[in-house]
Amino acid sequence: IHKSIVTTDEVRASGLLKDRIIITYPEEGTVNNDMAILQAAADDWKEKWEHWTQYCFEQHYAYVNPILIIQVLNGTGDALTDTNLDDCIIKIEERTGFKLESGQVVHTFGGTMATLTVNGLDVRYEEPSSIAEDRNIRVVFFKENLSTGWDCPRAETMMSFKHANDATYIAQLLGR
């Protein structure tokens, strides 16, 4: 066993630590606050996408393919989720200019491992531990299972439709 000293800059350069965490929420009274936050998240994700594309090209590195992670609401009644996933896909495509394709959007909803149809797009279930290795994945919808014990260095932007007050839960979610 050898002791290794690794600086924060080296870890950050590897992509395991993010340069910054930005927490944003619109002012009260803003129409559809959640979709405004999703718009901002999609804009941020696109900027990171462009940055990584340029950086990997310049450094002759394998392409990173950053992921947008979206925490959705639990469902009520028979609904799988109370978040309108169709609207989410539409908003992401509008803001980024990307036309998402089958295999690029996945879900980790433990209640169903079925493939969902969202805005005409097949959204398959993906085991959380497999997400980091699948370079085709761009967007992940989740409920709770990614909030603890999951790590994906490609996860560049996260947005949550859930309202949380518990400091421990918030810290765990941000730690992902």
Q: What are the residue ranges of the model-derived segments?
A:
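Conserved P-loop NTPase catalytic core
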Residues: I1-Y61, N65-I67
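A short beta-strand element within the Helicase C-terminal
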Residues: V139-F142, L146-A164, T168-L174
